[in-house]
Amino acid sequence: MGLPRPVLWLRRLWVLLQVAVQVAVGKVFLKLFPARVKQHIVAMNGKNPHFSYDNWAPTLYSMQYFWFVLKVQWQRLEDRTEPGGLAPNCPVVRLSGQRCNIWDFMQGNRPLVLNFGSCTUPSFLFKFDQFKRLIEDFCSTADFLIIYIEEAHASDGWAFKNNVNIRTHQTLQDRLQAARLLLDRAPPCPVVVDTMRNQSSQFYAALPERLFVLQEGRILYKGKPGPWNYHPEEVRAVLEKLHS
């Protein structure tokens, strides 16, 4: 069950204040200590060396940054997942347009790996080949599902330079069209999209990207949210332990 609405709105207000203070302090530090801030950002950026400092650092603490971070933090207030708990059986849509649910992809006691993300999230694409190798190595003992959610860095939102150019999805067809771009990368597992109500993204607190392992309807592994804590290698460790 989610939070009662009055409690949810009070927490949203508190988060709003926290994010506003974070952005204000960030702007001050960026103004007073630009070299130190750049050093910190470059160190973080080492986790995705194919996406340079100049592509995204100038957008830090912008109004678009503020709204995106606020959206992510508000979404996490409605997280309905916990290790060992029941996995939300949210509706999703196949690329054919057929509607189904997440649990439809579970088979007996085989683990089901959920990979939430979008093409405009650099870390999701940067680690896509790593995720594909995971599928190839464990396809005989586990199932995999990519759930395409709202864009992390839409071109009309908190956009980065030299990134994939996709606007905010206004319709389900927009989302399906964006998800089909992943097919060029030949994913060896089904790809579905979140509904326009963003229920799976909301209940799994998946924005901007996140990994889960389900088994028999329950959450076996809950990865931390990306971009910095999105680690397919942790899923590998979980699957290896299951079948050791």
Curated annotation (Swiss-Prot):
Q: What is its main location?
A: membrane
This protein's membrane topology, according to the annotation, is: Single-pass type III membrane protein
Pfam families (UniProt xref): T4_deiodinase
Q: Which GO terms describe its biological process?
A: amino acid metabolic process; hormone biosynthetic process; thyroid hormone catabolic process; thyroid hormone metabolic process
Q: What spans does the record annotate as topological domain Cytoplasmic, numbered to this chain?
A: 34-244
Active site (catalytic residues):
U121
Keyword Nucleotide-binding set for record: no
Q: Which reaction does it catalyse?
A: 3,3',5-triiodo-L-thyronine + iodide + A + H(+) = L-thyroxine + AH2; 3,3',5'-triiodo-L-thyronine + iodide + A + H(+) = L-thyroxine + AH2; 3,3'-diiodo-L-thyronine + iodide + A + H(+) = 3,3',5'-triiodo-L-thyronine + AH2; 3,3'-diiodo-L-thyronine + iodide + A + H(+) = 3,3',5-triiodo-L-thyronine + AH2
From which domain of life does this come? Eukaryota
Q: Does the keyword Transmembrane apply?
A: yes
Question: What SUPFAM superfamilies does UniProt report for this protein, alphabetically?
Answer: Thioredoxin-like
Q: Where is this chain's protein located in or outside the cell?
A: Cell membrane; Endoplasmic reticulum membrane; Basolateral cell membrane
Going by the record, the broad EC class of this enzyme is oxidoreductase
GO MF, one annotated term: thyroxine 5-deiodinase activity
* Chain segments annotated as transmembrane: 13-33
Could you state one GO cellular component term attached to this entry? endoplasmic reticulum membrane
Give the Extracellular compartment stretches of this protein: 1-12
Give the multimer and partner information. Answer: Predominantly monomer. Can form homodimers but homodimerization is not essential for enzyme activity.
What is the protein's known function?
Answer: Plays a crucial role in the metabolism of thyroid hormones (TH) and has specific roles in TH activation and inactivation by deiodination. Catalyzes the deiodination of L-thyroxine (T4) to 3,5,3'-triiodothyronine (T3) and 3',5'-diiodothyronine (3',5'-T2) to 3'-monoiodothyronine (3'-T1) via outer-ring deiodination (ORD). Catalyzes the deiodination of T4 to 3,3',5'-triiodothyronine (rT3), T3 to 3,3'-diiodothyronine (3,3'-T2), 3,5-diiodothyronine (3,5-T2) to 3-monoiodothyronine (3-T1) and 3,3'-T2 to 3-T1 via IRD. Catalyzes the deiodination of rT3 to 3,3'-T2 via ORD.
Instruction: Give the similarity note.
Output: Belongs to the iodothyronine deiodinase family.
What's the protein called, per UniProt? Type I iodothyronine deiodinase
Q: Which organism is it from?
A: Canis lupus familiaris
